[in-house]
Amino acid sequence: MTADIHHIGGAPVIIGAGIAGLMTALHLAPQPVVLLSRTSLGTEASSILAQGGLAASLGEDDSPDLHLADTLAAGEGLCDEQMARRVVEAAPQAVENLIRLGTPFDRSLDGRLQLGLEAAHSRRRIVHAAGDATGRELFRALLGVARRTRSITIMEGMTALRLVVAEGSIVGLLTVLHGAVFALPTRRVVLATGGIGGLFCDTTNPLSSFGHGLALAACAGAELADLEFVQFHPTALDIARRPMPLVSEAVRGEGAVLIDEHGHRLLADTPGAELASRDVVARAISDQLAAGHGVYLDARHCLGQKFARRFPAIDAICKHAGIDPAVEPIPVRPAAHYHMGGVAVDAEGRTSVSGLWACGEVACTGLHGANRLASNSLTEAVATAAWVAESVAGTSAGWQWPRLPATVPIRPDPSPIRTIVSNALGIVRNGKSLCDTVATLLPISVCETAAADPALVALLMAIAALRREESRGSHFRSDFPGRDAAALPSRLTLCTAFENAVTLRWQASERSR
């Protein structure tokens, strides 16, 4: 295969230009860094869609210990407690750093930061910007600083196709720009590619978010962690638009309740009610929908005419769909929202492949465990970006001519497998469906088609879900509804996943004889 060599002087390359990628690049300054974005900046970053905000113990009645306790409780035994403590202790300073970078967080009349309450938090500790447009405002501030930072080279429209590895270490990456293939020689690559929501029919993520970074890392030989844990946000706006608009948890934090089509409250007898953990609320709504009922979020009594002022973006989206939240309930359903699993990393974001780091949703730091605490994800991205950048900066630069792969992968498209993934890896799973899905995805994942890389990621997730024969957090198996006494994190490589998949397919063929 031939490709033009694009010389970047051995500078580190960050793949992904959402909040995790931008923060890492800014922390690397004044070191030169190359930032890749598949599209025009801001058009496909999941973090821009974030409404909830950042969680940090900023209130007088709050502390990092309380934030940690809530995080560990939500994670159901699978959080890395040391990493979780490090993140929650760094969170207040991370918010201060964002303020210095120009993020306009909401404040009360006396100038103090407004603190919101969200599900499974014991204190008000969520900071927002522009009410329900935190991700957009944060991204806008960071992008402005990045564009003014001369050490950051932003390459828009460039897609990373494969990482090039020699003797277990990164030596470059293969990219495509306007149909032309380029090789970028570098010994330092940071994955900041976001999540996997685009694998599902119902998602709040950009439809292109299929797990691009997971595919790159897996094909490079990196170890992956906890891939079975997918968080479904309970309250996406139930309209035809994709990605589905989010109805922020903060609406429930202000007192909105979930009702059926008859006005009966759904979670009155559930511990935590509307502010129970997301997996509990999502399963309850899913059960109602499966039984043929409608589910609605009713904010009329708690917010009424104040809804538009408190949640302007949600109000505008609802009204565009013909719904006025001030006077009528909002139709909702769960949607794939966040991936707790990802590329296994250490405390500095290093993966098992030398020269490869991961930051943000694509990374599995151990903070979230089996179920992410609301608004901890932006906090994680901002806090860990500093540690990733420090590690990258402390690693020797240099480059060599990368030996390129024989073929160029096709630009990925997850649309052919969305229904398959949604049916097998949704809120409720079972072994037979997962086995059938593995058998379906295996041949797709090794073909030279646009669905290959998305199928590869889905295959890895299905194998991980099969291997966890229990229900914990966001992973619910109808054939294994109980929770094991021991909480064990899962680890997987592409090689192991393929071995498992081939064995399962052979066993299925033997049974059918």
Swiss-Prot record:
SUPFAM superfamilies registered for this protein in UniProt: FAD/NAD(P)-binding domain (SSF51905), Succinate dehydrogenase/fumarate reductase flavoprotein C-terminal domain (SSF46977), Succinate dehydrogenase/fumarate reductase flavoprotein, catalytic domain (SSF56425)
Residues reported in the UniProt entry to bind FAD: 17-20, 46-53, 361, 377-378
Pathway(s) served: Cofactor biosynthesis; NAD(+) biosynthesis; iminoaspartate from L-aspartate (oxidase route): step 1/1
Alphabetical list of Gene3D superfamilies matching this protein: FAD/NAD(P)-binding domain, Fumarate reductase/succinate dehydrogenase flavoprotein-like, C-terminal domain, Succinate dehydrogenase/fumarate reductase flavoprotein, catalytic domain
GO molecular function: L-aspartate oxidase activity; nucleotide binding
Gene Ontology biological-process entries: 'de novo' NAD biosynthetic process from L-aspartate
Name under which the protein is recorded: L-aspartate oxidase
Annotated organism of origin: Mesorhizobium japonicum (strain LMG 29417 / CECT 9101 / MAFF 303099) (Mesorhizobium loti (strain MAFF 303099))
Gene from which this protein is expressed: nadB
